[in-house]
């Protein structure tokens, strides 16, 4: 089953609640929330307080993507704010700490995922795959929305699908054309920002991604 996760980085933050309700009504399966610290990536976005208010306006699962250094220091705060899913970057956390967080979060019923940047080889996450519920493959260099899809993500997705049975999510440059390619490669969760939030018809944009073949 293909799931569509509107990426709130591309939403209008002056009316975030209505933006969330709009994509929820249009058929979103979950919401992708990018958290950036200005260190791991150059941009700065939001913290646990904003996630808490997001939780108050939707029942959709919140996938909080921590693009931050030392994510283990902040995971508890984001869980307390109402996150349903937590994603950390393999480049930002040691394997031992990742395993510890995995055990903690799974006990709480929180889904735990790992993400890898375009330049990071798949071999980097192979030792920890059994500790995560999903993998997020970045198809742009993280930090800003509206970037173009990096085709090098496709063989990585295909190789990952051959060894991993959990959800494979893709984030970056997703539209109706790139959606076809990543789904064919083996991805089943697609995070899309600009394509959804800038569309004249939000529902049709989500449907085009979900039904891309």
Language-model features and meaning:
Residues 174-185:
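Acidic, divalent-metal-coordinating active-site segment for phosphoryl/phosphodiester hydrolysis
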Residues 1-87, 92-99, 106-107, 112, ...:
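Conserved N-terminal beta1-alpha1 strand-loop-helix module at the mouth
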Residues 140-142:
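Short glycine-rich anion-binding loops that position phosphate/pyrophosphate groups of nucleotides
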Residues 187-192, 197-198:
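Acidic, Mg2+-coordinating phosphoryl-transfer loop and its flanking beta/alpha structural elements
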């Amino acid at each position: 089953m293909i799931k569509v996760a509107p990426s709130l980085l591309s939403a209008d933050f002056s009316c975030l609640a209505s933006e969330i309700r709009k994509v929820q009504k249009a058929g979103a399966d979950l919401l992708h929330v990018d958290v950036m610290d200005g260190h791991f990536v150059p941009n700065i976005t939001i913290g646990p307080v904003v996630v808490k208010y997001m939780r108050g306006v939707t029942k959709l699962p919140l996938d909080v993507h921590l693009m931050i250094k030392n994510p283990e220091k902040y995971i508890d705060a984001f869980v307390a704010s109402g996150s349903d899913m937590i994603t950390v970057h393999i480049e930002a956390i040691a394997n031992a700490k990742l395993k510890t967080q995995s055990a903690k979060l799974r006990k709480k019923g929180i889904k735990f995922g790992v993400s890898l940047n375009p330049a990071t080889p798949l071999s980097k996450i192979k030792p920890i795959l059994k500790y995560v519920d999903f993998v997020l493959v970045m198809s742009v260099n993280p930090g800003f929305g509206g970037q173009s899809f990096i085709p090098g993500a496709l063989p990585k997705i295909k190789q990952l699908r051959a060894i991993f049975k959990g959800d494979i999510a893709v984030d970056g440059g997703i539209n109706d054309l790139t959606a076809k390619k990543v789904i064919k490669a083996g991805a089943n969760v697609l995070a899309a920002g600009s394509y959804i939030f800038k569309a004249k018809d939000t529902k049709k944009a989500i449907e085009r991604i979900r039904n891309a073949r």
